[in-house]
Amino acid sequence: EAKNTLIFIHGFSVPSYIWDDTFKSACKKGYKSVRLDLYGRGYSSNLDSDYTDELFANQVIELMNELKIERATFLGLSNGGRVISKIAYLKPELIQKLVYVSSSSFQEHKPMNDTSVSGKEINDFIKNNYPSISKGQMLDFKYPQNFKGWDDKYEQLLQYEGFARALISTRKNHVNLDLENKFINDSNIPLYTVWGDSDSAVVYNNFKNKLNKLMPRRIEYFISNSGHLPNVENSVEFEDILYNKILKEN
């Protein structure tokens, strides 16, 4: 009989391959494991709609229904932390545990009055960002020299029509998730936060006081020698904590 179900949610722009190492190790260990590309990323549809946390949450919930998964442990990386917070708020009965990895769910956001995306914005984004956006992915690592070719993988994403619009729309639809995160803390859902010790993309010290107020009962871990992607950069330490601590706790 398989162990518990793990659902891996990727971050802002890099799709499900960001979870490759952990997904494969989880499968080998006998966990039922699911990963997916959220709308606008990788192989999923590029929708002509607002890319909100709720859109992504409902996408995951629909997939769970399709696969007849009743409950799961969710691992949300970076922007994926926002998605798992929204899922837990909408459907807490689906949640076994929540694992936030380098999560951007706790930052401050000022709601935008206009969340539409114009053709000019898309063209400007492609012109100004596409030449360097792949190389910029290397900044997620503490030691980028150890991950040659990581940026080439990202370059393939730029060929998909609708990718730029999805990124712009997602950013424009970011709002504070204080209500959702407080709801989670007040629930009985086990919750964990995991951080790279040298993350320059989501800087822990910028929001740790807010996080301590919102989620004081969380259990927290820091992964050594890693930046924004501790699951990739120090997979040995990350997986030791995941399998031998987080997933073993009742």
Where are these regions (language model features)?
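Conserved serine/cysteine hydrolase catalytic core
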Residues: 165-212, 222
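Catalytic active-site module of serine/aspartate enzymes centered on a nucleophile-bearing elbow/loop
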Residues: 217-250
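Conserved HGGG/HGGXW glycine-rich cap/lid loop of the alpha/beta-hydrolase fold
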Residues: 2-43
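Conserved alpha/beta-hydrolase catalytic His-Asp/Glu region
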Residues: 109-115, 125-185
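Active-site loop/oxyanion-hole signature of alpha/beta-hydrolase fold enzymes
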Residues: 35-75
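Flexible "cap/lid" loop of the alpha/beta hydrolase fold
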Residues: 85-90, 97-128
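Conserved catalytic-core motifs of eukaryotic protein kinase domains, centered on the activation segment
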Residues: 18-20, 44-50, 109-111, 204-205
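Gly/Ala-rich beta-loop-alpha elbow adjacent to hydrolase catalytic centers
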Residues: 76, 80, 84
